[in-house]
Amino acid sequence: MFQSFFPKPKLFFISSAVWSLLAVLAWYAGGRDIGAYLGLPPLPPGQEPVIGVSVFWSTPFLWFYIYYAVVAGLFAAFWFAYSPHRWQYWSVLGTALIIFNTYFSVQVSVAINAWYGPFYDLIQQALARTAPVTAGQLYSGMIGFSGIAFVAVTVGVLNLFFVSHYIFRWRTAMNEFYVAHWPRLRHVEGASQRVQEDTMRFSSTVERLGVGLVSSIMTLIAFLPVLFKFSEQVNVLPIVGEIPHALVWAAVFWSVFGTVFLAAVGIKLPGLEFRNQRVEAAYRKELVYGEDHEDRADPITLAQLFDNVRRNYFRLYFHYMYFNIARIFYLQADNLFGTFVLVPAIVAGKLTLGVMNQVLNVFGQVRESFQYLVNSWTTIVELLSIYKRLKAFESVLVDEPLPEIDRQFIDAGGKEELAL
């Protein structure tokens, strides 16, 4: 799954995590100030960033682009020399580019949040008639937002195009790897589906979850300091009362609660998804045989195989029913949680409309980052089922025992109803 595309996968991912951590620490330990020697100084203390699209080519941003390129280039150069790999340009440099695009999308959110405050304060002044506000000022504010949105959409579309090629290259690498070992793999149940379909789904799902995880981490790095700052204004929570860093603790508590709650409710889903793929593969395989052999795909056999499909789907529907009830209830409550937390501050008159929108946006960004597992749980379930299927291939190639769920199927004589 990984060795076909990445050089020495285990060491590669560990080293990339360590290198990324060192790069972040070096940046905050003084790396961001080095740009001053190149004519790209950071913002002076106390000065607010530029509001609008021009922030993306301001001197602090330009220096970060150079810093990231150097860090990524050094990491790639090491791996190109240490463990050359056919797909190294896509797996190493391609991954670095996707991470950079993820960082850029987070900075778009930061830029939009900075735009919220002045614009909504302007609206409040116009509605309350506390200061003269012209239509031109409001139109100008909306044009500022449009500039940010245009850059975000352009970069986002280009990133999606690149990611599509990245995923297909990963699928190609897995396909070539498994086809090269096909004589040993062809006897594994549903081997054709595992090569043709599961490789495609695995690469796209891992990429989606990986980008989501990186985005969550970068969002926390970008927005947690802002949330700490706003916690100075919002230091009282409903029911709990006054506590330091109230907004941060509220976001952590609510996200951890949702993660544990939904993980417990959906614990049975990965195994059921795996079995669903197995019964579908068995039914499809018999139909394919029936296209070329008259003695295959007889009505009785097809009826038995379809009974397995129906039985597993009905079990899946039942378990997804209560999981979706729990998930939807939590997400609906989540829509109100930010406003619920701000009620004491709103009643006390501590917030303007602009600041309230900024706080809600920042709180939502941090909360969603902590809720990575909640928002990704159904995708994680899908990935686990795919991983279990491809893991059987890995086991055959390294002469390891098959995963338990495959052994149960073999021990049951290939009869799905006895393996459940």
From Swiss-Prot:
GO terms for biological process: peptide transport. Keywords: Cell inner membrane, Cell membrane, Membrane, Plasmid, Transmembrane, Transmembrane helix, Transport. The keyword Cell membrane applies. The keyword Transmembrane helix applies. It is found in: Cell inner membrane. It holds the Pfam family SbmA_BacA. It is a multi-pass membrane protein. Signal peptide: none annotated. InterPro entries: ABC1_TM_sf, ABC_transporter_sub-D, SbmA_BacA. One of its GO terms (cellular component) is plasma membrane. The chain crosses the membrane at residues 11-31, 61-81, 92-112, 143-163, 210-230, 247-267, 336-356. It comes from the Bacteria. One of its GO terms (molecular function) is peptide transmembrane transporter activity. NCBIfam families: PRK11098.1, PRK12369.1. Functions in the transport of molecules, possibly peptides, across the inner membrane. Is essential for bacteroid development. Belongs to the peptide uptake permease (PUP) (TC 9.A.18) family. This is Bacteroid development protein BacA. It comes from Rhizobium meliloti (strain 1021) (Ensifer meliloti). The gene is bacA.
